[in-house]
Amino acid sequence: MHKPLVSLAVLKAKPGKQQALKTGLLNLIEPTRAEPGNLDYVLFEQRDEPGTFYMREAFKDQAALDAHFATPYFQRFAAAADDWLDEPLQLIFLEQVSD
């Protein structure tokens, strides 16, 4: 059995684009959670740096993550996000070391 693929996506909004980025990210949550390979999808905003968002993500495997990236709603977000992001999205993959 494969270990889940767990990651944090770090997204920093351009000045004046914080709300647009937040709304775009919030719009991804419901359809992503309905994907058969999704295990976790939760959005956070950094307290001391408003406009910096972290999406905690877990998918059952690489194929499930690839399927997520190919969805029409993620593709729409990715196309729009270029205008909202101050720097390229950073995707940090994590390895669980405790229960």
Residue ranges of each PLM-predicted region?
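N-terminal first-folded block
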Residues: 5-35, 39
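Glycine-rich beta-strand-turn "strand-cap" elements at beta-sheet edges
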Residues: 1-5, 43-49, 79-99
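Short loop segments at secondary-structure junctions
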Residues: 14-16, 60, 97
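An amphipathic, aromatic/His-enriched active-site/gating alpha helix that lines ligand/cofactor pockets
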Residues: 27, 31-39, 58-92
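Short, structured helix-loop boundary elements
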Residues: 18, 22, 52, 71-74
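Short, well-ordered beta-strand segments in beta-rich or mixed alpha/beta enzyme
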Residues: 5-12, 42-69
